[in-house]
A protein has these predicted regions:
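Polybasic phosphoinositide-binding surfaces of eukaryotic membrane-targeting domains
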Residues: 128-171, 217, 246-299, 345
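Canonical pleckstrin homology
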Residues: 139-145, 178-228, 262-269, 304-363
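Canonical RING-type zinc finger of E3 ubiquitin-protein ligases
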Residues: 29-38
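Cys/His-rich, Zn2+-coordinating zinc-finger modules
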Residues: 3-15, 44-125
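Short cysteine-rich clusters marking metal-coordination/redox-active sites
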Residues: 23-26, 43
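Surface-exposed beta-strand-to-loop junctions
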Residues: 1-5, 25, 64-67, 84-94, ...
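Disordered regulatory linkers adjacent to lipid/PI-binding modules
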Residues: 125-127, 226-278, 288, 296-297, ...
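Eukaryotic cytoplasmic intrinsically disordered
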Residues: 99-125, 205-241
Length: 368
């Protein structure tokens, strides 16, 4: 048997081992590439970033490239578990570890942080001060604003000018969330920050031209949230806190809605369903700064349910596929443009309704 064939078989056996069967960087199954300088098995997507890190990483295809005996022996001695012990030794509990379907900037900066910058050997500070491009509250334009995030008082401040002494806004991290939204923001490093102000959800849309900077901001928010929640929810453990640091919405998209009397004309609105706080928010457009309204979603035992609404000629509705969400106070009728969207929304509502309530949910006035 030729050494090329023999080495390919050895590599294919190595990649079947449990610790190597998923990409070392994003967890994608069945990695087809490997870094012969780091000794890790990675997927095609992550191999692209490794290919840019020529000082620390070199990649080959497991199946298509020729592997010399010494490189195969290096892969045998190392592997994903050995690399993880070295390069992820001190990853902070709050730090977001990107998964297969996360946006490019998160995966790219995670790989660079691990191998090129080797960041995870010291303690992260709970402070961040810098400039971000921020969308105006009632304008489409983005303008530079100075932001300061502090763990000392658990706040995020932003200033109109870099030398301003008085903050335009002081935002508590208590109900803050941050999520990457490159498509919505229109920039590959786009970040959406949400928080509560006067019982309404406020959106901030920001970005930074540098991918490392925006990922640092994202993880700084997670760091300060982590410190806050450890204090507020003591003695909760990390496994309970991690899902609360930052969360993606369960589903977003347009539906049409009518008013409480159900004879008002239907209007198209942008809806956001959040499973952690069990809320359905709606906005006029995806980039609105403030919600138009919100509905808390309890369990079936509290009188909440969702069902398909028969197709009918609804007053002012251009769309045909309806669904009804029943609550103790009123029924909400929504119309979807496509049948697939209707099914997806019903499935998402059912998922939230089926989740057990947590102690913090009982403070909602709808359940008292």
């Amino acid at each position: 048997m030729a050494s090329w064939d023999r080495n390919t078989i050895i590599l294919l056996d190595l990649v079947k081992q449990p610790e190597n069967a998923r990409c070392a960087d994003c967890g994608a199954p069945d990695p087809d590439w490997a870094s012969y300088k780091l000794g890790v098995f990675v997927c095609l997507n992550c191999s692209g970033t490794h290919r840019d890190l020529t000082d620390v990483s070199r990649v080959k295809s497991i199946r298509l490239d020729n592997w010399e005996d010494d490189l195969v022996e290096f892969m045998r001695r190392n592997g994903n578990a050995v690399a993880k012990a070295q390069y992820e030794k001190s990853v902070p509990a709050f730090y977001y570890r990107p998964q297969q379907h996360d946006c490019v900037v998160l995966r790219d900066q995670w790989i660079r942080a691990k191998y090129a910058r080797q960041e995870f050997t010291g303690k992260n500070a709970g402070f961040c001060d810098g400039t971000l491009w921020k969308k105006g509250k009632n304008k489409r334009q983005f303008q530079k604003r100075r932001f300061v995030l502090s763990q000392d008082d658990f706040t995020l401040r932003y200033f109109i000018k870099e030398d301003s002494k008085v903050a335009k806004a002081i935002i508590s991290v208590r109900n803050m969330n941050a999520v990457f939204q490159p498509e919505k923001v229109g920039h590959q490093n786009g970040l959406q920050i949400t928080y509560m102000t006067e019982d309404r959800t406020r959106n901030l849309f920001v970005y930074h031209e540098n991918g490392q900077e925006i990922v640092n901001w994202f993880n700084a928010v997670r760091a300060v949230r982590y410190a806050y929640l450890r204090k507020a929810l003591a003695p909760a453990n990390d496994s309970e806190l991690m899902p609360l640091l930052t969360t993606r919405s369960l589903k977003e998209g347009y539906m049409e809605k009518t008013g409480p009397m159900q004879w008002e004309p239907f209007k198209r609105r942008w809806f956001v369903l959040c499973s952690v706080d069990r809320k359905l928010l709606y906005f006029k457009t995806p980039m609105d700064a403030l919600e138009l309204g919100a509905v808390f979603i309890g369990t079936e035992a509290h009188g909440f349910s969702v069902r398909e609404t028969p197709t009918r000629g609804s007053r002012g509705s251009r769309w045909r596929y309806g669904l009804t969400m029943e609550t103790p106070d009123r029924n909400f009728i929504f119309m979807c443009e496509q049948e697939l969207e209707q099914r997806d929304w019903i499935k998402a509502f059912q998922q939230v309704i089926a989740q057990p309530l947590l102690p913090q949910h009982y403070s909602n006035k709808k359940l008292i």
